[in-house]
Amino acid sequence: MALELADYERKARESVMAFWGNREKARQKQQESGKPDQGERRRDRRKNMDGFCALVIDIIRANGLHRAEIHQKRALLTLPGYFRPTKLWDLLVIQDRRLVAALEFKSQVGPSFGNNFNNRTEEAIGTAHDLWTAYREGAFGQSPRPFVGWLMLVEDAPESNQRRADTSPHFRCSRSSRAHPTYGGMTSSASGSSRSSFTPRPRSSPRRAPPPRQGRIPSPRI
């Protein structure tokens, strides 16, 4: 049966606009409070990605999981791990006491694309490996393999498209890491279904110094 994508292209465009709009509102609020360099708080980052959470929920509902429990409240987002005691996710889908899906929603804007790429890569791979090890060891009971998703919104900026000049004095870097820009090659990961979605910063916004169940949401055309 074909996957029902619930008009995802239109909703993705709206989610991108809401992302930048929420960031701008938070920036203005910080300036008014006299703390312009405070940076994004966790609750602000989560709010910025609310549109994408809603889009994923629409897709879940449109594909038959009408009875599923979809959790977004912090108190209900913790899963057991293996190498660490627990992991706090952004969205969990549970039906009949079985874990159906666990998803993370991340964003990356400038300026430190290179360093943050490494951090995000380690986070995605580590999170996935931890969850799958916990699953293998029976942390989630006798349930089918869950869907594990990692959705990342990346600012389409010159810095995020630059090819890295990494060198390794002892061994050759892999061809795939040399062939792709900083974020250009991040289209899949050990999380199972992971897509990077490039989005340009709106011109009106001031610029700051940017094996699981198969299935993926194509990157929207912005």
UniProtKB/Swiss-Prot annotation:
The gene is abrIR. The keyword Nuclease applies. One of its GO terms (biological process) is DNA restriction-modification system. Residues 21-45, 161-222 are annotated as: Disordered. GO terms for molecular function: DNA binding; type II site-specific deoxyribonuclease activity. This is Type II restriction enzyme AbrI. The keyword Cell wall biogenesis/degradation does not apply. It catalyses: Endonucleolytic cleavage of DNA to give specific double-stranded fragments with terminal 5'-phosphates. Keywords: Endonuclease, Hydrolase, Nuclease, Restriction system. Residues 188-202 have a biased composition (Low complexity). It comes from the Bacteria. InterPro entries: Restrct_endonuc_II_XhoI. It comes from Azospirillum brasilense. Its EC number is 3.1.21.4. Residues 22-42 have a biased composition (Basic and acidic residues). Belongs to the XhoI type II restriction endonuclease family.
